[in-house]
């Protein structure tokens, strides 16, 4: 016999059933197209007429939230309707044609790192919006993420709030509360299992979902370090990059204070390759969570992706008492970074990288090694501080001290090296004098192609690049990037405009705290740098970046070919 719900929705088949009710695939008989939809039947777990009114009110409130969420994002199913019938509650939502991540893995095996990164990068902006509405999903897992057939986008389904309303009871104080905990064992963290979920609880679940996609292992199949609570999973995913591993590790940290504080922060870490230390400012507990005192870190984002609109903390009116956060376990937070800059919730990511300028007056007198790995201890790590550098005419070469020095801070409106006020434009020729060698007379200036030993060092190229940015000469800095980076639409969706939005609009200053040569030959070089960003918003963040440079013989300079 044909089943018709609410005299409208014709049931095609049952998609699933459980303690809360059943889920059907149905057709809307009152739509000309007989549009397919998902109908979820929910029943209260307590058959108590006294609390039925409370259940009804909470159900209506949560359904309204679902409507709001679905109307914003194409990656959350649209709510078509909700109704009640025979003490049961029904939600009618968009039918998403696609495969769950569980089904996808069963079809083709574990996913590649790039596929998992794409899923995370596409889902985190959705989670950011959900959290901005003070909603915690509470049941993120492979079964609740569908890869839509028509565009391959991940869609987040089955929010837990509506189901939770079915467990409404009256506590001993006479207040309505829920008698059930929403979530899936293994995918939900300890605070959620205790009935105190926070925003980072969703990030924890998403991190474990990523591990499942990379390894094929369910959380219950993974061991846990008994002292720290750390989940041991790296042995099952040996070929993934340290950056992705670090992002996942922070997302699944046992204590919420050690996780990313927001979906935006996790997204930036993925896009930039920068996993920062947890912030030291307290975070306010979301209103939708229970009122047991519990503290989550603040919304602090890591460069270079923050904007005024996407870093607003989502919190209730009453803040918990600020307490410092323990950083003992955060040493694994910072790994390798990439200099990707800019972005949006769906946004642009911009890379700022390094190379030298042909007119730079400071060069390194040591010869550039060929195909040699150089110890950090034997390589100049930073340019000497301005206070330690004697005033030198622009036409003189300064020998760089091979001993690591203090970090150099380049103010926006000042140069780190002393030059005459009426110095020539940036297209001025190279200095024509050089420091004589002790045993041989100075060689005359030559016009033939520059040999490798006369080139500016790759380390100096990194410092010069940030000097250019700190002076606000963004177009010059942009032209110091390799064309492959300029034209990479994943990094610069709008080309130079994306680059300028980040460096000109968000960053106040960048300190080059340390720079060292890893290896080099006549055509390529690899440089490690430690950077500190000073944002116009007042925030600070550090990152470690590994630059790959290639020699641009036409312009006698190093240009960046990669960074991570």
From Swiss-Prot:
- EC number from the UniProt entry: 2.7.11.1
Query: Which reaction(s) are listed as its catalytic activity?
Result: L-seryl-[protein] + ATP = O-phospho-L-seryl-[protein] + ADP + H(+); L-threonyl-[protein] + ATP = O-phospho-L-threonyl-[protein] + ADP + H(+)
Active site positions, chain numbering: 139
Q: Under the GO molecular function aspect, what terms does this record hold?
A: ATP binding; protein serine kinase activity; protein serine/threonine kinase activity
Extent of Polar residues compositional bias: 360-406
Q: Where is the composition biased (Low complexity)?
A: 428-445
Q: Where does ATP bind?
A: 15-23, 40
Which SUPFAM superfamilies does the UniProt record give?
Answer: NTF2-like, Protein kinase-like (PK-like)
Instruction: Write the record's keywords in alphabetical order, separated by commas.
Output: ATP-binding, Kinase, Nucleotide-binding, Serine/threonine-protein kinase, Transferase
Protein kinase domain segment(s):
9-271
- Where is the segment annotated Disordered? 360-458
Alphabetical list of InterPro entries matching this protein: Kinase-like_dom_sf (IPR011009), NTF2-like_dom_sf (IPR032710), Prot_kinase_dom (IPR000719), Protein_kinase_ATP_BS (IPR017441), Ser/Thr_kinase_AS (IPR008271)
A Pfam family hit? Pkinase
Instruction: Give the family, as the similarity comment puts it.
Output: Belongs to the protein kinase superfamily. Ser/Thr protein kinase family.
Q: What does this protein do?
A: Probably required for both normal cellular growth and differentiation. Inactivation of pknA leads to colonies that appear light green and rough in the absence of combined nitrogen.
Q: Tell me what this protein is called.
A: Serine/threonine-protein kinase PknA
Q: What is the gene called?
A: pknA
């Amino acid at each position: 016999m044909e089943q018709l719900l609410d005299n409208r929705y014709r049931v095609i088949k049952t998609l699933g059933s459980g303690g809360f009710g059943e889920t059907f695939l149905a057709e809307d008989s009152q739509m000309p197209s007989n549009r397919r939809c998902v109908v979820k039947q929910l029943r209260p777990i307590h058959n108590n007429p006294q609390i039925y009114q409370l259940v009804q009110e909470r159900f209506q409130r949560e359904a309204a939230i679902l409507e709001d969420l679905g109307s914003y994002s194409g990656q959350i199913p649209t709510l078509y309707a909700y109704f009640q019938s025979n003490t049961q509650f029904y939600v009618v939502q968009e039918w998403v044609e696609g495969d769950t991540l569980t089904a996808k893995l069963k079809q083709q095996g574990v996913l590649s790192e790039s596929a998992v990164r794409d899923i995370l990068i596409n889902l985190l902006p959705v989670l950011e919006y959900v959290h901005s509405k003070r909603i915690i999903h509470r049941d993120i897992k492979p079964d609740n993420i569908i890869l839509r057939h028509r565009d391959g986008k991940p869609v987040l389904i089955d929010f837990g709030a509506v189901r939770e309303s079915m467990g409404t009871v009256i506590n001993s104080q006479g207040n309505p509360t829920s008698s059930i905990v929403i979530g899936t064992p293994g995918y939900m963290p300890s605070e959620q299992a205790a009935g105190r979920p926070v925003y980072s609880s969703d990030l924890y679940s998403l991190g474990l979902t990523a591990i499942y996609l990379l390894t094929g292992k369910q959380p219950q199949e993974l061991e846990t370090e008994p002292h720290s609570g750390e989940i041991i999973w790296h042995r099952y995913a040996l070929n993934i990059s340290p950056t992705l591993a670090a992002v996942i590790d922070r997302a699944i940290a046992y204590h919420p204070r050690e996780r990313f504080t927001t979906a935006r922060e996790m997204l930036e870490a993925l896009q930039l390759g920068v996993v920062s230390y947890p912030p030291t400012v307290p975070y306010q507990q979301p209103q939708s969570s229970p009122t047991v005192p519990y503290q989550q870190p603040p919304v602090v984002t890591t460069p270079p992706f923050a904007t005024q609109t996407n870093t607003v903390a989502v919190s209730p009116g009453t803040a918990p008492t600020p307490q410092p956060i323990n950083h003992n376990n955060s040493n694994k937070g910072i790994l390798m970074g990439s200099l990707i800059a800019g972005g949006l919730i769906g946004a642009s990511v911009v890379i700022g990288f390094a190379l030298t300028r042909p007119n730079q007056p400071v060069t390194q007198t040591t010869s550039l090694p060929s195909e040699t790995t150089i110890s950090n201890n034997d390589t100049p790590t930073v340019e000497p501080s301005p206070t330690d550098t004697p005033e030198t005419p622009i036409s003189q070469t300064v020998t760089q001290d091979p001993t690591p020095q203090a970090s150099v801070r380049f103010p926006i409106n000042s140069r780190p090296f002393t030059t005459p006020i009426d110095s020539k434009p940036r297209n001025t020729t190279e200095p024509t004098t050089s420091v004589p060698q002790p045993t041989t007379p100075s060689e005359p200036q030559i016009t033939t192609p520059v040999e490798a030993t006369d080139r500016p060092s790759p380390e100096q190229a990194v410092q010069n690049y940030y000097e250019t940015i700190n002076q606000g000469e963004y177009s010059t800095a942009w032209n110091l990037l390799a064309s492959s980076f300029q034209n990479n639409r994943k990094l610069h969706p709008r080309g130079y405009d994306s680059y300028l939005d980040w460096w000109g609009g968000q960053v106040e200053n960048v300190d080059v705290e340390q720079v060292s040569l890893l290896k080099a030959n006549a055509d390529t070089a690899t440089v490690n740098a430690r950077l500190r960003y000073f944002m116009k918003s007042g925030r600070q963040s550090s990152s470690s970046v590994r630059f790959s440079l290639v020699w641009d013989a036409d312009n006698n300079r190093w240009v960046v070919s990669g960074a991570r």
